[in-house]
């Protein structure tokens, strides 16, 4: 694990799941975007994770209340989605600002499956091949329910 990643974990008070740590160490996600999921806006991804998960200079934050939910971090954003990683079990959630619950749309069982599914859709589009159907993607990523299937339908159809 890189020093910046370790410092980000310490700052955020979490331990990144192994699948997340492996890919973050392997790839520079600082300026990476695929299928309308943007991981960073340039620069160091570990710094971006800290920025996304701390109160900003204007008091803005993605969570309600004083304290960020334990073990949850935003790791990417897209229009209109905010992507949450549960550092306790590795699950990935797609959250909309209007959702009453943070973790009611589990779109993948872990970061590697989520990343591979997004990359597969992106590569299929770039190579003008058939995009995998949402049901196949949902099965591969071990998505939670019909809400997750709705997310993958939208993602595969963009």
Predicted segments, located by residue:
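Glycine-rich, aromatic-bearing surface loops/beta-hairpins
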Residues: 114, 135-146
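Generic alpha-helical propensity signal that fires on short helical segments
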Residues: 30-34, 38, 91-93, 110, ...
């Amino acid at each position: 694990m890189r020093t910046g990643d370790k410092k980000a974990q310490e700052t955020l008070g979490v331990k990144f799941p192994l699948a997340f740590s492996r890919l973050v160490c392997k790839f520079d996600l600082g300026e990476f975007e695929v299928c309308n999921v943007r991981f960073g806006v340039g620069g160091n991804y570990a710094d971006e994770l800290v920025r996304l998960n701390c109160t900003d200079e204007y008091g803005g934050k993605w969570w309600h209340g004083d304290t960020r939910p334990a073990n949850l971090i935003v790791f990417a954003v897209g229009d209109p989605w905010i992507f949450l990683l549960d550092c306790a079990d590795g699950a990935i959630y797609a959250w909309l600002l209007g959702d009453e619950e943070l973790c009611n749309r589990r779109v993948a069982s872990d970061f590697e499956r989520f990343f591979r599914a997004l990359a597969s859709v992106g590569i299929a589009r770039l190579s003008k091949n058939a995009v995998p159907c949402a049901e196949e993607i949902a099965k591969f990523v071990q998505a939670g329910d019909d809400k997750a299937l709705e997310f993958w339908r939208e993602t595969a159809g963009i």
